Swiss-Prot record:
Catalytic subunit of the phosphorylase b kinase (PHK), which mediates the neural and hormonal regulation of glycogen breakdown (glycogenolysis) by phosphorylating and thereby activating glycogen phosphorylase. In vitro, phosphorylates PYGM, TNNI3, MAPT/TAU, GAP43 and NRGN/RC3. The active site is at 150 (proton acceptor). This is Phosphorylase b kinase gamma catalytic chain, skeletal muscle/heart isoform. Keywords: ATP-binding, Calmodulin-binding, Carbohydrate metabolism, Glycogen metabolism, Kinase, Muscle protein, Nucleotide-binding, Serine/threonine-protein kinase, Transferase. GO terms for cellular component: cytoplasm; cytosol; phosphorylase kinase complex. GO terms for molecular function: ATP binding; calmodulin binding; enzyme binding; phosphorylase kinase activity; protein serine kinase activity. InterPro entries: Kinase-like_dom_sf, Phosph_kin_gamma, Prot_kinase_dom, Protein_kinase_ATP_BS, Ser/Thr_kinase_AS. The keyword ATP-binding applies. One of its GO terms (biological process) is signal transduction. CDD domains: STKc_PhKG1. Belongs to the protein kinase superfamily. CAMK Ser/Thr protein kinase family. Its EC number is 2.7.11.19, 2.7.11.1, 2.7.11.26.
Amino acid sequence: MTRDEALPDSHSAQDFYENYEPKEILGRGVSSVVRRCIHKPTSQEYAVKVIDVTGGGSFSPEEVRELREATLKEVDILRKVSGHPNIIQLKDTYETNTFFFLVFDLMKRGELFDYLTEKVTLSEKETRKIMRALLEVICTLHKLNIVHRDLKPENILLDDNMNIKLTDFGFSCQLEPGERLREVCGTPSYLAPEIIECSMNEDHPGYGKEVDMWSTGVIMYTLLAGSPPFWHRKQMLMLRMIMSGNYQFGSPEWDDYSDTVKDLVSRFLVVQPQNRYTAEEALAHPFFQQYLVEEVRHFSPRGKFKVIALTVLASVRIYYQYRRVKPVTREIVIRDPYALRPLRRLIDAYAFRIYGHWVKKGQQQNRAALFENTPKAVLLSLAEEDY
């Protein structure tokens, strides 16, 4: 058993061990390990996040103090948003001189990231459900002046019914009225332009809740395309792309999506934060509203007849399209297999299984970039790197 896999001493964490039995590791962070655990009185399964505030003895006293304060702040925010159906629920907390134990609901479906890896890309319908729930969470957070600062598919969990639960509030903070942030933290490919600018310009006024909306746009783009909107093998060039808002809807996947969904993505990925969509504005976008209207509409007899008539017309059109459609020949498949949607999805799925990573299909597209995000990446010296 490695040091990372070793469990905290049962004597120093007696209260935790009296109530819970830790099991296998589910995930790791820079200074934490997440394990499945069993609540002894009820035999209920939970997930426990074990945070080593000493970094295994490698942290300085100042770093230990900062991590302890950050963990207490995370616990405080989780308690303030407790009860929201799409936010992970904190069940129990335990503290020793060296460790924190945070007990959460166990999400057996795992991360949205893993689901995307399996599915390659998501449909507009699936994306709509996920993004609506995420935006409702962000609305709640922002009304409380809480900014998450680390929104990404890895921090969105799924329950058995495919409902999302936002997790990992380690970078979150509650702003005072008029307060602006300057700390550079987050995951590189999800960073908003103003966060990067803060690291390069001492006179920058700082950033606010708008950074969450940029990350939301990156998430939505990634769910639909299967790859992030901003990527370059050299990180500083990728950060340049972010700062200039240089992205495209150029990959073949976008041919299958509506202009409405592309419009919403573009409303998030706006370089100037004051012009970026808020969560409330996004929920009022036609991408969501057109389906809300349909959900509450009551059918009248006339409406039922109209549906039947349209169904008959659609059936006739499908029949004639079927009679006219050109067969897919061997030559077409050999010449451009990626132009055919079923083959495209099949190729993507098997490429991952064969090579262990997604296959790059263009200069601006690389699914392997999804796997380059290290947990809890803190960027402290962007300004010192060469352009």
